[in-house]
């Protein structure tokens, strides 16, 4: 399925996205097989020395699913085709999740470099380059003033992803990295499926991104405001917040329950309520 013409790339991306949305929602073994064929035909990359280093790292960490290692003074990560033993609501079977993630990363990077660069793809594991520090850690290590521009870039990167017709699935700030030297945002962990079957996945993306920020219980909303400004800086995506507000209104009963339960300070529930309140009170810019 190799495509060399730049004129056919947009059509291919739309077709790939339509198929991927079906896979996310139906979790079909047939389309899982399609992903495997697509990935293998186009992207099998084999650096024998790198593969040997990766296999050695796996041998030393046989029970781990994600393994960092160093090869030729460069930091890499291995992600293996095995279950993490949790979060079955958001994630699929190990095989489906593995091939979905490979497909998503490679497809996204064809259009815009916002996924980790895949340097080695094997039947049972993927090797990607290290992409920097998670935003969750950035917010803890740096001052608010130092972090604002980084979160602006994160919001802009998410809008850029959406503007190309893609979505992440769960863009939590622990799975978004900042590479200071390259001044680059990267989204990790692409194996999540769409949890709300009748909702636009990009709308869910934006809500979950904000909710992951509110989970941190920062004393102010300055970093969240910066991320929102970054998202709104891409004109084509400005209407996305209206979609999020519509989503909240369409599921008002669920959010009303979250509001009542927020008094117990369960962070997952509280952060949902805080996100909904923030979005509903957000003025259009």
Give the location of each predicted region:
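C-lobe/activation-segment region of protein kinase-like
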Residues: 186, 191-284
């Amino acid at each position: 399925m190799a495509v060399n013409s730049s004129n056919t790339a947009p059509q291919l991306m739309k077709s790939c996205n339509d198929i991927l949305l079906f896979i996310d929602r139906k979790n079909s073994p047939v389309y899982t097989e399609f992903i495997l064929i697509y990935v293998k035909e186009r992207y099998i990359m084999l650096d024998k020395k790198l593969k040997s280093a990766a296999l050695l790292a796996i041998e030393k960490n046989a029970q781990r699913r994600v393994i960092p290692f160093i090869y030729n003074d460069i930091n890499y990560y291995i992600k293996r085709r095995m279950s993490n033993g949790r979060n079955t609501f958001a994630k699929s079977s190990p095989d489906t999740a593995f091939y979905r993630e490979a497909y998503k990363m490679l497809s996204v990077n064809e259009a815009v470099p916002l996924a980790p660069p895949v340097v080695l793809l094997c039947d049972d594991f993927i090797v990607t380059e290290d992409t920097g520090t998670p935003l969750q850690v950035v917010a803890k290590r740096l001052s608010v003033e130092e972090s604002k521009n980084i979160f602006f870039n994160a919001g802009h990167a998410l809008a850029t992803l959406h503007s190309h017709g893609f979505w992440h699935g769960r863009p939590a700030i622990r799975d978004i990295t900042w590479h200071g030297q390259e001044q680059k945002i990267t989204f990790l962990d692409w194996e999540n499926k769409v949890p709300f079957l009748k909702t636009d996945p990009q709308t869910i993306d934006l809500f979950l991104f904000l909710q992951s920020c509110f989970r941190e219980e920062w004393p102010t909303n300055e970093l969240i405001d910066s991320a929102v400004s970054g998202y709104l800086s891409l004109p084509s995506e400005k209407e996305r917040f209206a979609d999020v507000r519509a989503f909240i209104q369409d599921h008002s009963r669920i959010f009303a329950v979250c509001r009542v339960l927020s008094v117990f300070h369960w962070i997952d529930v509280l952060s949902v309520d805080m996100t909904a309140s923030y979005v509903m009170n957000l003025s259009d810019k």
